[in-house]
Amino acid sequence: MIAKCGVKLDYSKSGITSHVSSSVTGGDFDFNDISDTFLTLAALSPLLKTPLSIHGISHTRKQETDRVSGMVNQLKKIVDHVEESDDSIRIVPDGDFFKKAINKPIEIETYEDHRFAMSFAILGSFDLLGNNQPWLRIIDPMCCTKTFPNFFKTLDFCRTKVENGQ
């Protein structure tokens, strides 16, 4: 799935190294069998150069929260064009809209759902404005401690490895 978007992963004994093409694209993906992970790809959609369609996710409306509507509501704070149906979402990223819209950190609601906190934290770790300033604020980020107590420590470790060129 991520290879189709333009990301190549190399696996070794020391870990996983990702190689991202200069033009990371969206696509059309069925998440029915891996529905818990749709939030991560959807949250990363502002990084894409082309539209992203995710379907097979209607049953996620009945989890900790209505994950489809919740994701759409949060993405509308970042992306100009997001469509929702019973079973899908479609996101049309626009980097220019996104960068113009940020004059203070965008607040992301987690709905006390760990997957929202973790998915948007990954997006927030990117320095999209190129000024090394926070541009995303996650409300109740620690709701993820019930499933991944060291998530933010691990994310910070991964970022440190990238920033140091390792």
Regions found by a protein language model. Give the residues of each.
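Short, structured segments at the rim of ligand-binding sites
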Residues: M1-Q166
